[in-house]
Amino acid sequence: VLPGLTLLDLLLRHHPLAAVMTSPSNHTLLSQALAGKATCFMQSELPFLDAAKNPLPFSAPAGNGCALKHLVEKGIWDTWKQAGIEYVNVLNVDNILADPTDTSLAALAQAEGNEAVMRVIPRQNPQENVGVIVGEEGHWHIKEYTELTAQEKDLTQYLYASISFFCFSMSFIQKAAALSLPLHYVWKKIPGTSLSGWKCEYYIFDLLP
């Protein structure tokens, strides 16, 4: 990355069709800052739940599992399709070392005839807050770190970690938009309050075929 340039700056230099998923708390700010540079689309929210999983009067973003659905519903997929886009890199904003302009995953997907590929790295220690790569019955999927048992966190159990960097074909995105995903529950502090509750989220890795 060039000095003074963020990864988003780098992305927008090379891919003017970039899209950024926002939340209600930052949508206006990001939309104004990126006007004419990227398409901003806002994710939906879900309520926090109490210990008995009853809704509380507080909400939070529904998670990155909604991203592909929003791309289709908000017309962004149509725009990209008309522009001749075939593959889309999808990565989380907290992955600050990822290069959104990396075309190697798309090249791999095209060469191998795959509609969804992901980048993984070797795990470093059992306490890392990263999802782990699990192979079962010929399929690969990701298990979130908050849902791992002590045994599953052992480095000898699962060797590789997800860095939330995916590449999807446009046809896969269109199909994924119609899928129903399971909810994941994480006990968290509710921002702006002294309370804690179950935060409900959809995870994008549940879309993996």
Q: Where does each model-flagged region fall?
A:
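Short catalytic/ligand-binding loop motif for oxyanion handling, primarily in non-cytosolic enzymes
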Residues: 28-29, 48-49, 98
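N-terminal glycine-rich phosphate-binding loop and ensuing alpha1 helix
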Residues: 1-32, 36, 55-56, 60, ...
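Soluble or luminal CAZymes and related metallo-dependent hydrolases
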Residues: 3, 63, 196-199
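Short, conserved secondary-structure transition motifs
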Residues: 22-25, 44-52, 123-129
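Structural alpha-beta junctions
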Residues: 35-40, 111-115
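Divalent-metal (Mg2+/Mn2+/Ca2+)-assisted nucleotide/phosphate chemistry catalytic cores
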Residues: 41-93
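A structural signal for isolated positions on well-ordered beta-strands in alpha/beta enzyme cores
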Residues: 17-19, 39, 89, 117
